[in-house]
């Protein structure tokens, strides 16, 4: 037997690799797991929370800094959480995790982030000094919190639409399963 025949199956290029329309890093990103309206909402959450964080970082002086610091923490956390959720939805990580757990995590993270971001924006409104950077951060904060809460409402509507489909079909099957086998 010749060496070429022994080693040829292991040295051939794997099918589907090489230069194509989706090679390299682009092959790892799949945007189709979310409907188009949810993709837009997730992108707006990411963008607006980043803009709120950047505008807040530009603020150089503050009178009552507690609201500013809380807003800073919340806007940065919202940005990182929305980035994490987008990474999970758009990469092969989504295939390795249970889809129900991803949806449930997204549901509760979006609700919590939206509520806390709204609270941080309200607190920042009551403690800001009136500079243009603070006002821009507040506007982006309210817009970002509204995108988070709108995404939560969309997920809630989808969840309520799915729930009647999952009701038990027949209780007679359950009764038949509990009967003894030797009867």
UniProtKB/Swiss-Prot annotation:
The keyword Zinc-finger does not apply. The chain crosses the membrane at residues 46-66, 68-88, 107-127, 135-155. Its main location: membrane. InterPro entries: Marvel (IPR008253), MARVEL-CKLF_proteins (IPR050578). Keywords: Acetylation, Cell membrane, Endosome, Membrane, Phosphoprotein, Transmembrane, Transmembrane helix, Transport. Residues 67, 128-134 are extracellular. Residues 1-45, 89-106, 156-183 are cytoplasmic. It is found in: Cell membrane; Early endosome membrane; Recycling endosome membrane. It comes from the Eukaryota. The modification N-acetylmethionine is found at residue 1. GO terms for biological process: endocytic recycling; protein transport; regulation of protein stability. The modification Phosphoserine is found at residue 8. Residues 33-160 form the MARVEL domain. It is a multi-pass membrane protein. Master regulator of recycling and plasma membrane expression of PD-L1/CD274, an immune inhibitory ligand critical for immune tolerance to self and antitumor immunity. Associates with both constitutive and IFNG-induced PD-L1/CD274 at recycling endosomes, where it protects PD-L1/CD274 from being targeted for lysosomal degradation, likely by preventing its ubiquitination. May stabilize PD-L1/CD274 expression on antigen presenting cells and potentiates inhibitory signaling by PDCD1/CD279, its receptor on T-cells, ultimately triggering T-cell anergy. Belongs to the chemokine-like factor family. This is CKLF-like MARVEL transmembrane domain-containing protein 6. It comes from Mus musculus. The gene is Cmtm6.
